[in-house]
Amino acid sequence: MSRRPNFGGMGMGGMNMQQMMKQAKKLQAQMAEEQENITAQEFVGKSADDLVVATFSGDRKLKDIKIDKDTIDPDDPDMLQDLIIDAVNKGLSQIDEATQASLGKYTKGLM
């Protein structure tokens, strides 16, 4: 019968469960702070020539949208729709990039 190695109550490379929980709570607090920082920021997406400008909060809520009055053409609603989609997508992409840059260091290797 083989004996199991004795790690003196320690596991995971010498770190006990209490230390692991303390470290996990510390990381959780750091991640929450990073998320709060992102949420407090504003992100602005702009279409070509700034004809449509969409402003978001960091929690992905649309706060404002500005449409250049010369862009509104009743005969071409598709162009305005495309400009709005472009501005909104650019704003959301900025939030995603900021989130990845800020929180990616915590999730690296988990996915």
UniProtKB/Swiss-Prot annotation:
Entry keyword annotation includes Acyltransferase: no
InterPro entries registered for this protein in UniProt: YbaB-like_sf (IPR036894), YbaB/EbfC (IPR004401)
Cellular component, GO annotation: bacterial nucleoid; cytosol
Compartments it resides in: Cytoplasm, Nucleoid
MF term (GO), any: DNA binding
Keyword Cytoplasm set for record: yes
Keyword vocabulary terms for this entry: Cytoplasm, DNA-binding
Gene3D superfamilies per the UniProt record, alphabetical: Nucleoid-associated protein YbaB-like domain
PANTHER family associated with the record: NUCLEOID-ASSOCIATED PROTEIN YBAB (PTHR33449:SF1)
HAMAP family, per the entry: DNA_YbaB_EbfC (MF_00274)
NCBIfam families on file: DNA_YbaB_EbfC
Similarity section: Belongs to the YbaB/EbfC family.
Free-text function comment from the UniProt entry: Binds to DNA and alters its conformation. May be involved in regulation of gene expression, nucleoid organization and DNA protection.
Subunit annotation: Homodimer.
Listed name of the protein: Nucleoid-associated protein LBA0378
Naturally occurring in which organism (per UniProt): Lactobacillus acidophilus (strain ATCC 700396 / NCK56 / N2 / NCFM)
